[in-house]
């Protein structure tokens, strides 16, 4: 918990948006997830997004005081491709969850991976899905080949193809929130995906690569695309970080641990990066 609070404090004060609570937390008891959401929400001063698999209505109700949006990792809306890649999680339960979330007043979002075998004509299926479910936000990810998977020897989509999906989606939905995933190996994509219509970048390890050459490249490319980043990837604010911890309504022992984690992270972020 302390590490998550520490990261949230850094993110808030550097102007980084919190995309969503996800990952292994899906296996946590709902009350523990609620506590995590409560603390991150407290740091940011607003409700957060979550991406935790299929949520039941009773769990949505428990999380609602701290959660404003629910994301579904659809990956692809082309059903045959989806069923071949994700045989254990069909689209239907996610579809039902998104519709229920909307009825209960949540914002909704989906994630889509580009480069997994989809075709350009599948974009019309994506548009239909967005309209049917009244999606507020979409996150695109470019396939990252992972050793030991069926995509181990598949190349990531090139910049032009990845940007095409973003551009066409932006043209169809001018008011849709569009987030584009970015890996350290693909920082040269930034200018193109911002010009294509992405609002936000995600997946870049901002703390680990803070003030690195790659972080500097992202800022330069954003400027070249005539886009101003809301936060900084290269400059730490001159603030009293301990005061940021003291503001929080958490117990003294947790505060002490958060301060330790925060100090460790800030030392790493202040060191010179060569990559």
Model-derived regions, located:
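Core AdoMet radical
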Residues: 1-5, 11-32, 36, 40-96, ...
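Glycine-rich anion/phosphate-binding loops
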Residues: 1-6, 121-125
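Conserved C-terminal portion of the radical SAM core fold
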Residues: 18-21, 92-150, 161-179
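Active-site-proximal loop/turn and secondary-structure-junction residues that shape catalytic pockets
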Residues: 25-27, 52-58, 76-78, 114-118, ...
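Alpha-helix-loop-beta-strand connector modules within alpha/beta enzyme cores
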Residues: 29-52, 73, 89-107, 153-178, ...
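Catalytic cores of alpha/beta
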Residues: 56-66, 116-131, 184-196
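Auxiliary Fe-S-binding modules of radical SAM enzymes
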Residues: 133-275
